[in-house]
């Protein structure tokens, strides 16, 4: 009997354990949108070209256009030297006046192909000194210390993720170097700095008995052209490919879970990271993720922006990462601080005083603090006395910044994606309580609250806020429960600038009545909470709390951004 009872207890405990783990797994699944981001690989192509002992090439400058075209057509493609001759021939042809469409298309295509065949094996060897082939020496204009990936060497595993190439001439690639953490590198991803690069023919000349081929290798941050004779050709470059190679190397997605359950461990990675070079002439777009998430959720949207030449030339993309277990208002204060730091160090970035904010789920709550004027409403919802009656120490003013803030920019465009403006019912469910129990708040946050409350006294907390301040502060899940005072107050604050909403649904995609709208729910946030009265326009898309990757929502965001470029 005792054995049976013991076995029964074991089975009961095991069942309870499995149920709890199942709830945790469900919570994690519902609250996040993370997935594997390994979608490309790199092929290392070895040259199949043979080499000659003696290289020589004719002077094509005085050859008539049509004769030169026929000569280029007749050249071989078997050896490295053949490819150099073809490159020199097409280079001369591209400088001729009045090329036919067929001649120009041929010349550009063969120029690019021959150059790619020449440099691909050289880059694979990662040698920065001249490469010697008999009496032919090949070198690059700039000795770039880092890794280079040619676009022809990128093997895409996910056909939905593609990159556009802007331009027509030269070989496009990606240059990658380590992040030095110095200067502007402090605002770039820690995984490294990834930039588009273009290769083109610099010069081919004979020095004594030797031939020297020099190849221009230029990092392109915007469209540039190459003058050849009286003709101008735009150089190939691909901002989206640089981002894809960065994402393939990124490890920030490994901090989604850690950032939620133990935010202190992930705090070192907190920041705002510019995907491209900081640019005073481009409007920043800040993309902010939600609970148990990371910046890689913005993969498809970021690619769409980088693949659109007009939008790429108008906007610069910044990704925010924050450990999501800490409450959103604390995280918002930290992100505002980082944002203002960037703008203070680079005042030119703020010359238009215009910003775009795109937030998913709780990230929308974080972003909302960037575009609202709080006055003392959030403070009054928390404390019974005004700041000037409570603030005494320098650390107290850090506390004030959590509750009192102004819009960062004068002009704003806000996109709220699956955002629980009134909280999420799942945060109040058993799943939410289990998720909340997993979170260990960081000492930095707890110490800030503890020292302040111990000094002013818990009696200075409002009755509504008091339950949330047990153990010196709520975590993010507790803050997102419907009825939280700060979320309610923030929901009523006017948003400065234009507002758009993207709402997810696992069922119907539109609603005309209150009863119908109750059916719109993405599994985490319902329509009532996701709907924002201040939105100029909202759309409902098929989504399980992952509208950030929905094609309809991406098209909607891009369309609104294009409208903004016309203003």
Put a short name on every predicted segment.
Residues 1-17:
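N-terminal secretory signal peptides that target proteins for export/translocation
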Residues 74-81, 90, 94-106, 111, ...:
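Serine-dependent carboxylesterase/thioesterase catalytic core
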Residues 278-280, 311, 349-351, 358-359, ...:
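Extracellular/periplasmic catalytic domains that process cell-envelope and extracellular macromolecules
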Residues 299-315:
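Short amphipathic alpha-helix adjacent to the substrate-entry channel of hydrolases
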Residues 440-567:
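C-terminal subdomain of alpha/beta-hydrolase-fold enzymes, centered on the catalytic histidine
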């Amino acid at each position: 009997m005792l054995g049976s009872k013991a076995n029964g207890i074991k089975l009961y405990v095991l069942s309870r354990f499995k149920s709890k783990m199942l709830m945790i797994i469900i919570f994690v699944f519902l609250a996040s949108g993370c997935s594997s981001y390994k979608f490309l690989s790199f092929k290392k192509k070895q040259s199949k070209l043979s080499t000659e002992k003696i290289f020589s090439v004719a002077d094509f400058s005085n050859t008539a256009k049509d004769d030169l075209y026929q000569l280029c057509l007749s050249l071989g493609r078997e050896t490295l030297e053949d490819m150099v001759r073809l490159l020199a021939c097409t280079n001369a042809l591209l400088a001729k006046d009045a090329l036919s469409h067929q001649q120009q298309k041929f010349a550009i295509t063969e120029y690019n192909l021959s150059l790619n065949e020449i440099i691909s094996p050289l880059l694979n060897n990662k040698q920065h000194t001249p490469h010697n082939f008999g009496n032919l020496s090949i070198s690059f204009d700039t000795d770039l210390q880092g890794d280079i990936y040619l676009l022809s060497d990128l093997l895409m595993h996910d056909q939905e993720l593609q990159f556009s190439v802007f331009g027509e001439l030269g070989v496009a690639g990606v240059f990658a170097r380590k992040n030095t953490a110095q200067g502007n590198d402090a605002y770039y991803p820690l995984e490294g700095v990834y930039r588009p690069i273009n290769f083109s023919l610099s010069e081919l000349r004979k020095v004594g008995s030797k031939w020297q081929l020099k190849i221009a290798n230029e990092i392109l941050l915007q469209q540039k052209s190459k003058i050849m004779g009286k003709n101008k050709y735009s150089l190939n470059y691909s901002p989206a490919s640089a981002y894809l190679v960065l994402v393939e190397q990124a490890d920030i997605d490994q901090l989604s879970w850690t950032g939620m359950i133990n935010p202190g461990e992930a705090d070192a990675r907190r920041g705002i990271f510019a995907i491209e070079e900081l640019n005073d002439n481009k409007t920043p777009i800040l993309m902010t993720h939600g609970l148990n998430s990371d910046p890689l959720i913005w993969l498809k949207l970021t690619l769409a922006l980088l693949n659109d030449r007009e939008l790429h030339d108008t906007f610069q993309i910044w990704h925010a990462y924050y450990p999501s277990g800490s409450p959103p208002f604390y995280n918002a204060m930290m992100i505002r601080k980082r944002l203002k730091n960037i703008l203070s160090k680079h005042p030119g970035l703020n010359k238009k005083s215009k910003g775009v904010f795109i937030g998913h789920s709780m990230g929308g709550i974080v972003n909302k603090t960037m575009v609202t004027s709080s006055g003392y409403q959030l403070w009054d919802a928390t404390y019974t006395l005004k700041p000037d009656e409570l603030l005494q120490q320098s650390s107290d003013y850090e506390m004030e910044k959590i509750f009192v803030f102004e819009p960062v920019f004068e002009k704003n465009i806000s996109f709220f994606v699956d955002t629980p403006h009134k909280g999420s019912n799942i945060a109040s469910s058993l799943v939410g309580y289990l998720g909340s129990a997993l979170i260990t708040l960081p000492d930095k946050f707890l110490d800030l609250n503890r020292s302040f409350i111990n000094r002013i006294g818990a009696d200075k907390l409002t009755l509504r806020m008091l339950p949330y301040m047990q153990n010196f502060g709520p975590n993010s899940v507790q803050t997102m429960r419907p009825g939280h005072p700060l979320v309610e107050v923030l929901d009523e604050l006017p948003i400065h600038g234009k507002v758009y909403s993207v709402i997810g649904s696992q069922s119907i995609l539109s609603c005309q009545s209150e009863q119908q709208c109750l059916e719109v729910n993405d599994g985490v946030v319902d329509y009532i909470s996701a709907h924002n009265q201040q939105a100029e326009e909202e759309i409902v898309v098929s989504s399980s709390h992952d509208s950030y990757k929905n094609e309809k929502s991406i098209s909607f965001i891009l369309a609104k951004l294009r409208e903004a470029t016309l203003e």
